[in-house]
């Protein structure tokens, strides 16, 4: 049995983008674990794709295509990137790699030749790498210790540092740099410097491969690199379904009485154990790990070129004949062109086979999904003490400790209210009717609607497996569900969340607060939550308690209706020569900090007793752990908040916020001159008056009442992120409003629910933002929609309609009232994109392109969207939304109807608007 090894390559690429395909062959042929590259000549944001590998860069500080280094590492290895060192005199990319002999820092080092180095510079550089490292790179230092006939000043300084014995040089003793200038002597510039490893553990050799004036070096460390644990599912994809179902049919023979909480936990445990047994019996007998890296299959012509180039390279290294160097350069160019043609042919074949239907397994949408989200490389995380997390396991603990603090309630509520809440929660219930029983048919209907592409929770039970359960298993499951409702106890196994952290775009990746938690909950628990929610929504007290101005988490409600309310209110103020003063409030960590006693206090007043007990059990004793690269943190408690990712969570938050202040506290203006608009935790409050002082006073009255409500229920408002906007055609702005003594910053425009609302509601800033976002998205999809590629025209049009166009038309039923000069910018974006997609010549008219591609013109699109929107408003379940529809406007009392003074459109005018 061969000893496990870690293979580390080193290469000065002189430009990595040109040699990426040849590097891919090199990585495959030698099964390289870590590749250290220098002189990558890559700009910030520039990427190359190497399947199965991750790349961490240290760019030149100028941002230009010069210098730079990169660590290319197998994605399945346990590693943690460190902050790169990027200055004019050094570019060092580094990662922490976990091996069987401990964690080692692997660094790619490039030291430009023009900079002067002294002994202290080398000492500080090595100190930054730690006590155990392997640093390979182009040091531009010559000395006899690593194979140079002559020494340079930098080489002498480096040799002086190494001579103390703490560091060792790992080199082949052969030249690695063969200049294109025949007058320059070959020299050894590329080598490794190690610390903390005995030389007996390391082997090194020079390879006559890759196209550059530097030869690659391969070092072998006799240690086993640790691999990330693989996340598996309970039932394998190629399992025998018949065996799985047959074994579960035995659940019909289980005779189990469930009378109390312990029985429910035992029944849940029994059900999962039976599922695990069935999955193991159904698993394929010859299960083996599929190797992720296979040698590339290359055509014979390219293999011949590779062999010939290597022979010529060896001959040139042996003889130094300039003619051999010229032949090698020509062969390298031929190889580069051949690899480029092969890559383009592969892309053409791939694009030609893409499709948007089931016959191609929806391959078009699979590939576009990969490019819709901006890729975020892994980053090092700072721990609370200011140091760096060296391993993925350390990351999990740092994230978990941070979340544990976040899942803790604030302490603002007065003691008198806390006592009142506590006393009420301990008071006895009133008599009520029993809940409707869960039937087998109800369970089947819920399971049939489960989405298949959802990650499983801690129990590894995914929705695909649940859909395969036989009736006997579903009957046992229905028994558990009914017991949960009868006993009023939510199983403990369904209250554990596995959390993964997702980086927030634009935030510092090294900060632990720059990551958003995403919870993976047990699927069976989610089904139980849906059953509870269905029964909650039939309670009239619950539906009445949630205010009408809350448009979030409600059926047949969306962001356009709430935006329409805000815009319509401001437009009416402008028509009446009034000021509309608005405050857009930011509730800090609204869902994570929900005060459980306060939520239960409100729930007990509204919910039937049995549902209240289940919800109470649902919130109590919840736990979580954080998962990073397959490693799990210790289990932490959740003391506050509604479970993120749960089915019940949104409705519970709506109940918690249901008693927030309405227009009642406002006395400075009339009731109809106050607008409250909430969508989930996004809250907007507007007041209007002919007097800017009266409108401001009315808004301040509401904010004072809202601040008092927030303190009573342990809610924190972040005044720094709140915004104050004045909507008016007149001069003058709100003199200022405050929250908890802090002045809210006044803005000329604010982005609310994805639409930028400016002072005069021209939507010019919003359309400018649309242009920027659309161009970015088009650039990301450019390789798919380019006119010369092999992707069919129909697929390109599908990409435009399904992925690109929604960026243009979101909220069109509201911002469509903008001036034609602004809307024309949207029309131009569509015209340019369609012309690019179709490859139409310059003389072809845009309207002909739109007709041939069956893409509606902007005016037709606007009318169609507005017409459907108005039809929906006319029959909307919410009376606040129905007031916005054309039917309500036409049938309104003429005495109360707003007189149209300004020459501008309102949203209900859009169905009849004609754009030329």
From Swiss-Prot:
InterPro entries: DNA/RNA_pol_sf (IPR043502), Endo/exonu/phosph_ase_sf (IPR036691), Endo/exonuclease/phosphatase (IPR005135), RdDP_mobile_element (IPR052560), RT_dom (IPR000477). Keywords: Nucleotidyltransferase, RNA-directed DNA polymerase, Transferase, Transposable element. This is RNA-directed DNA polymerase from mobile element jockey. It comes from the Eukaryota. It catalyses: DNA(n) + a 2'-deoxyribonucleoside 5'-triphosphate = DNA(n+1) + diphosphate. One of its GO terms (molecular function) is RNA-directed DNA polymerase activity. The keyword Transferase applies. It is an enzyme of class 2 (transferase). Inactivated by sulphydryl reagent. Its cofactor is Mg(2+); Mn(2+). Residues 483-757 form the Reverse transcriptase domain. Optimum temperature is 26 degrees Celsius. Pfam families: Exo_endo_phos, RVT_1. Its EC number is 2.7.7.49. Prefers poly(rC) and poly(rA) as template and activated DNA is not effective.
